[in-house]
Each structure stands twice: as structure tokens, then as C-alpha cells.
Amino acid sequence: MLSSFPHRKTWRKSKKTVKVTRSYPTFPSLNAWEEFRGLLPVDGEPNPGAGLGVEEGLLCRVVHSPEFNLFLDSVVFESNFIQVKRGRNWRDVYKASNTMALGVTSSVPCLPLPNILLMASVKWHQGQNQTWNRPSIAPNIFLKRILPLRFVELQVCDHYQRILQLRTVTEKIYYLKLHPDHPETVFHFWIRLVQILQKGLSITTKDPRILVTHCLVPKNCSSPSGDSKLVQKKLQASQPSESLIQLMTKGESEALSQIFADLHQQNQLSFRSSRKVETNKNSSGKDSSREDSIPCTCDLRWRASFTYGEWERENPSGLQPLSLLSTLAASTGPQLAPPIGNSI
């Protein structure tokens, strides 16, 4: 028998579970930004510097080996050269199996420019292919020189033959011809390095978060900003002479001591001219004591603006930018090969 009551509908709604996915912005890591800027090699791709034979070579391995254990955190920019001697025609000094590895590095990795020169003689085995990146049989390499770059003069001697001239502080001159297995791009790197060592860099930091608090090139080179012109006008009153400025740009301690002596002498003369001559011994004693107490560093703010920066100092102070050695071969692709004859 059927029921006369209609079927009641349940008014309760069934609960449904809804999954809500929140999307958060993802930021790339620091290494990703560095790879985007071309400063680090992308995973799976070879290091362009190592491919050209200017990084991670034999000289770098010898210096970083447990035998020497030097400059472990610094990049070594190096190339393979053949020592030649000058004459009517360039002639090799040693046999073809003997080459020379020349490189530069930084004693402290935070320095923006290199300050150490490395030289090593390489003796290859008979019939061995002179591949300096990863040779099948390691050649005999002997580290000959570790010199501060401030005591070394490096310049391009023959652009067509790809020959560099290296002069040490003892007047020893080396003529080094770039190994023929190196591409033309590598010699342009050395030309650029010579220009950097002679004139400095206007921009020397890879990381924009690092603030450069010192000048890396002399103010008298070229500066389009108006603030530098005002600084130069203020500095003209305190500059002793043009010869002193030239000595000062060298960054030598003898030149600086001479500058301090000249400044102290000028302060003494100006102080004496402003004071009347007194015959009293006591007053003269007071004057001499005042003259001796004149500080020499009161108007030496202009001194730092004419030096080449902290990279010449053995013990740098303050916040330093990262090393720029790897940026010589940081870019990838065919952009590394500029046309022959054009300077970098």
C-alpha cells in the first residue's frame, strides 16, 4: 500500500571541498641573474674562458695546487706564449717543445683589477699536442716568477705578430709571442688588459649592489659630470705643482713622502709670512712649536682622487667590488671575435 504523504526534499546542501591554489611570485636566484647577465656559464655549456684557454689552465692549476696553495679564491687569466728575441726577424729563443705560460691574478679576490703577474716555463713531451686546457699527459711546468704588477711594464710590441713586451723592475725584457693555437680574440684580451693596466677602468664592478667608494682612474683623464668639474676647481687651490701631481699618480711611497714634505714646507712659509718676526726667544720657540704641529693631512683629500685606486694598495680597506678578471671572457658566442685591426 502506497503512502499518501509526498516525499520530503532535504534542504541541506551537500558540502563540497574546493581546493584553492595560491600563486606566489617566484624570483630567480642570484646565479640565474648572473647567468642572464652573461657572467656565469650556463649549466651544460662549457666555460668560454676555458674554451679559449685563458681560464682554468695549467698555470691556474699549478698556483692552486697543494704545492703552492696561492690565490685559491682568485681567477687566473692566462695564455700560452713563445719566447722570442728581437732582430731582423723574430726568432724563437727555445725549442718548439718549450713554451711560457703568462698570467695575471689578484692577491685578494675582492680587488677590481689584477695586481699579481705569474710566469711559468712549460716543457711539453716530444710529439705532444700543446693543448693547455686538459692535456692527456700533463707537461712539466715550473713556476718562475711571481711579481707585483706595479713593478712590471706590459705593452704591445708587435700587433701583427701578436708579440707582447714585458719589462721587469730589474730591466729584464721578455718578448712573448702568443701561441698560434690561440685565436685572435685572446690577443685582443691582452690588448684590453694592457689598456686597463695603463689607464684603469671607469666601471669596475659586476654587482650593482656593491657601492664603489673610491676613484679607480685619475680625475684629470675625462669626466663628463659636472660634479667632478667642481671638485677639480676646489682641488686646484690645494695642488702644489704639476710635477707633484705626476709623481702622485704613480702611487709610489717616495713620491707621496716628497709631496708631504713640500706641503709641510709650504705651510711653514705661509705661516711665517702671516706672522711678524719676533726677536723674543720664547715667542720664537712658540712659533716653531706651532709650525711643527701643523698637520700634513688636513688638505690631502685631493690625493686619493689622482691615484689609480685601492687596487694598487697591498692592504685595501673598505668595501671592494668583485674581481673583473673573468669578464674579459665572460661573453659567449661570436661576439668575442672582433675584426682584426680594431682595438678593444
Swiss-Prot record:
<dbReference type="GO" id="GO:0007340">
    <property type="term" value="P:acrosome reaction"/>
</dbReference>
<comment type="function">
    <text>RAB2B effector protein required for accurate acrosome formation and normal male fertility. In complex with RAB2A/RAB2B, seems to suppress excessive vesicle trafficking during acrosome formation.</text>
</comment>
<dbReference type="Pfam" id="PF12480">
    <property type="entry name" value="GARIL_Rab2_bd"/>
</dbReference>
<dbReference type="GO" id="GO:0001675">
    <property type="term" value="P:acrosome assembly"/>
</dbReference>
<dbReference type="InterPro" id="IPR022168">
    <property type="entry name" value="GARIL-like_Rab2B-bd"/>
</dbReference>
<keyword id="KW-0333">Golgi apparatus</keyword>
<dbReference type="GO" id="GO:0005794">
    <property type="term" value="C:Golgi apparatus"/>
</dbReference>
<protein>
    <recommendedName>
        <fullName>Golgi-associated RAB2 interactor protein 1B</fullName>
    </recommendedName>
</protein>
<comment type="similarity">
    <text>Belongs to the GARIN family.</text>
</comment>
<feature type="region of interest" description="Disordered">
    <location>
        <begin position="271"/>
        <end position="293"/>
    </location>
</feature>
